[in-house]
Amino acid sequence: YMNEYMKETNEALLHTYNQFPVVLDHGEGAYLYDTEGKKYLDFAAGYAVSSLGYGNQELNEALKAQIDKLFHTSNLYYNTVCGKAAEDLKRITGMDRIFFTNSGGEAVEGTLKAARKYAYKKGTGRYEFIAMKESFHGRSFGALSVTGHDPYRAPFEPLVPGVSFAEYNDLDSVKALVTDKTCAIILEPLQGEGGINLATEEFMKGIRKLCDEEGILMICDEVQCGMGRTGSMFTWQSYGIRPDIMSMAKAIGNGIPVGAFAMTEEIAKYSLEPGDHGTTYGGNP
């Protein structure tokens, strides 16, 4: 089966997805409708993105109003909405400083740079990362370098050096990889692509304690498991700990390309400064 839309897409786009033979036309709530009028209950939610459903009128009206007013200026200028959005994220994360991005992968890249800059400014000489086996953090070069899934990594190696991989939920495995060059430990509190693996309380608290004792930063990637998907706003909040840096995206925007990374004030004091990092579209109104 091949209609004009599929044919046009297949002839023009790079083939990086094996797409279902369905051409979607519109959505309403939790349902999607194709060009032939068939109705589908959507369990995928756009890869954990469509948190408010399809055709959400309140969201649509807000978007229309802002587009008519102003939708991009760059981060060289203040605008009327970015600060409020950042304050909202501070409130729900308990973090102190926010940086807006265009995607989850970009947010993860920011967390890695923030950790490296912190170590650089502190003069520790640390640069290595410990990540988890079967993790997924994104497809850009830095994010892929801390992704512990060989089929995704193999075609692009060598990747960023200085990354080692521990067994998930195995604190001894993590401890065995710590050196005086370890800059940060990055993990998903709930692994998605790795098989819906939930971190144990012992593991999360153990990582936090290890980081505190060894002068290592703890990074939690909440791009997929965050925004209320596990009973708390962010999964790490269920463990009674707080990471130093975190990433988020997907369900924040309900399909609008927005993500963010956040950090504590202590990290921000010694981390990214003007000239260290940027984004062309991130944080636009």
Describe the residue ranges of each PLM region.
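Conserved N-terminal phosphate-binding loop of PLP-dependent enzymes in the Aspartate aminotransferase
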Residues: 1-285
